[in-house]
Design a protein with these regions (language model features):
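Core of compact, soluble alpha-helical bundle domains
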Residues: 1-87, 117-151
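Elongated alpha-helical scaffolds
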Residues: 96-114
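Long amphipathic N-terminal alpha/beta scaffold segment
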Residues: 83-86, 90, 108, 113
Length: 151
């Protein structure tokens, strides 16, 4: 997005710096935590891993957004839900189980939280929860038996 004022330009630059720093920390943590050994990572073919990385970047950008006004916060939560639905649809179409998809998401969310300031955690968790609900919604739509078994 384009900044309309010097203040917005500074804020955008600061946001980009925070996102870049978090992305570097996440990459280091992923290497340290040996993501390659995670069962959910092994269950996804190479093209799916590329898509997971792209989703991760979009998710990181969304989770690290400073929201300001309440209306903007609601827009962000709607966007988080839609992103979760999109991710869930793609992973289920690739044959990745709901359990593996959730484990991958929780692993990534933990990396984001470990890489950010605790003062932003409640905002990040709120958005991440909307992603999880969207993800579950998409799996449920593809396989209604998921909910009928639970009831």
């Amino acid at each position: 997005s384009f900044a309309n004022s010097p203040g917005q330009a500074r804020e955008q630059g600061r946001g980009d710096a925070i996102e870049g720093s978090a992305l570097r920390k996440i990459r280091r943590n992923l290497n340290r935590n040996d993501v390659l050994q995670q069962p959910w990572y092994q269950s996804v073919e190479e093209e799916g891993k590329v898509r997971m990385r792209l989703f991760g970047r979009r998710l990181l950008s969304l989770l690290l957004q400073e929201t300001g006004p309440r209306r903007r916060r609601q827009e962000l939560l709607v966007e988080a839900h839609l992103l979760g639905r999109e991710y869930g649809t793609e992973m289920s179409e690739r044959g990745v189980t709901l359990k593996d998809t959730i484990e991958a998401f929780v692993f990534f969310r933990t990396m984001v939280l470990d890489s950010t300031n605790p003062s932003s955690w409640s905002r990040i968790i709120e958005a991440a929860d909307r992603v999880l609900v969207g993800l579950a919604d998409s799996y449920e739509e593809r396989d209604p038996a998921i909910t009928t078994l639970a009831s």
